[in-house]
Amino acid sequence: MYLTPAQVKGRIKNIAKKNKADPITLMRIYMMERFLERITYSKYKDDFIVKGGILVTSMIGISMRSTMDIDTSIRNFDLTKEKITEIIYEIKDIKLDDNIEFILNDVSNIKDNMEYPGIRIHLNAKLENLVIPIKIDISTGDMITPSEIKYEYPLLLENRTI
């Protein structure tokens, strides 16, 4: 659904006031949701397992916990900067009726000394002249305990799930 920047800001402000939450954090969550929805329309939708803060925030509510990034595990392909960059370009370029553009800023290795290395993606989410930085951490090999589930993620500004 297309919302103007003023509509997005207004809805975020109302939700922030109602939940005693930080509007900037809510704006970041909204932009992360826009990227997550693009994943659901991509051929990689079954390869990404969302975990961490954004998932917990959606389950317990924004007044209880906020998050700064999207944490995911991937499966079915090698975790290399080149492959992840290719995948992110495909996902970010999926057109939805939200007028949001994602600009890829950086792709870097994280957890170099860990058993399960990862990739960090830095994007800017742009809605006209409103620009919000977001991060996506992608890892592989982590055990998902007890196991991954299909989850209907409730969107912040719309009465629907992805």
Model-based region annotation:
Residues 1-162:
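Compositionally biased terminal segments of proteins
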